[in-house]
């Protein structure tokens, strides 16, 4: 997983390789639950949460509309055309179902559910075939914004060279940060703690301190 600098999106970069000598017919499923941006709704007021959001699907993009925020939208999309989707948690997990045995995976197909109100999730399905030794790469994109923003991000990061460039950019960014001060001790673990981990934690705290 990686977050490109300057973008409000999380990229799940997934590679699947067939290491056997047989052709494999596979299905990839995503699953996540959207946040309400409010801990009282997310973790406590479960009755109110049933009326706080709606979900829809169009052109390979799941959009969640947060009714209590004028511009509150979230999306899930990918660099492939989905073969199925579900936006309602109970449809994917099943009635009284859990993530251990989701009904959608047991069926092998998703139901195409959307709803105004209720509990929402983001599940996309992609069926694909891999020849022996063949590898497939999928990029799933979870971000802040409406469907139009999702389309922009989908076009941008469906180009795998741009995904690779995100890693290069982040590596260069942190290399510059770390280069400001390097301390060497006889203990390699202490070096990592001082030169990498402590600096990283300090940077993250500064980023989130005013939010």
What do these predicted ranges mean?
Residues 113-121, 134, 175-211:
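Substrate-binding groove/exosite segments of carbohydrate-active enzymes
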Residues 1-2, 111-115, 125-130:
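Beta-strand-rich interaction surfaces with strong enrichment in secreted/lumenal proteins
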Residues 20, 32-34, 136, 144-148, ...:
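Short loop/turn segments at secondary-structure transitions that flank enzyme active sites
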Residues 24-26, 128-146:
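Short Pro-Gly-centered flexible turn/kink motifs
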């Amino acid at each position: 997983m990686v977050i490109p600098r300057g973008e409000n999106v999380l990229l799940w970069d997934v590679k699947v390789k067939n290491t056997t000598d047989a052709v494999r017919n596979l299905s990839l499923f995503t699953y996540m639950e959207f946040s309400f941006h409010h801990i009282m709704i997310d973790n406590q007021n479960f009755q109110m949460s049933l009326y706080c959001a709606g979900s829809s699907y169009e052109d390979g993009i799941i959009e969640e509309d947060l009714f209590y925020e004028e511009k509150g939208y979230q999306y899930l999309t990918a660099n492939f055309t989905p073969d199925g989707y579900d936006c309602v948690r109970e449809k994917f997990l099943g009635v009284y179902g859990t993530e251990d045995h989701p009904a959608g995976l047991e069926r092998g197909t998703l139901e195409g559910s959307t709803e105004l109100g209720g509990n929402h999730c983001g599940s996309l399905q992609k069926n694909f075939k891999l020849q022996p030794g063949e590898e497939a790469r999928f990029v799933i994109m979870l971000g802040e914004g409406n469907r139009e923003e999702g389309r922009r991000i989908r076009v941008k990061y469906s180009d795998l060279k741009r995904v690779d460039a995100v890693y290069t950019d982040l590596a260069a960014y942190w290399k510059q940060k770390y280069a400001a001060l390097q301390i060497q001790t006889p203990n390699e673990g202490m070096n990592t703690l001082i030169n990498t981990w402590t600096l990283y934690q300090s940077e993250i705290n500064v980023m989130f301190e005013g939010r």
